[in-house]
Amino acid sequence: MFDIKEDQNGVVVKVRVQPRASKNSLAGEMEGALKVRLTAPPVDGAANEACCKFFGELFGVAKSKVEIIAGHTGRNKLVHIQGVTEKQARFILK
């Protein structure tokens, strides 16, 4: 199971990003992280922007409520989603 931690404002999800995919989608688990495929290339923050937008749409929150808190320049990221509980996150991501 991938790592999800709840804090006072929301949840932090450990994510492994695969840029330049054919479509934006969840792709299971990889090395304890949620694998996410994104169509955006890893250039000038495009994949990071797409990652925030994808999680915002997935959880039904504004893109501004989703923030990458670690891993800005790598594939492994920690994504913070405000206004979501761990239970809600596990239900949506299962």
UniProtKB/Swiss-Prot annotation:
Pfam families: DUF167. GO terms for cellular component: cytoplasm. SUPFAM superfamilies: YggU-like (SSF69786). It comes from the Bacteria. HAMAP family: UPF0235. Belongs to the UPF0235 family. NCBIfam families: DUF167 family protein. PANTHER family: UPF0235 PROTEIN C15ORF40. This is UPF0235 protein Dred_0717. It comes from Desulforamulus reducens (strain ATCC BAA-1160 / DSM 100696 / MI-1).
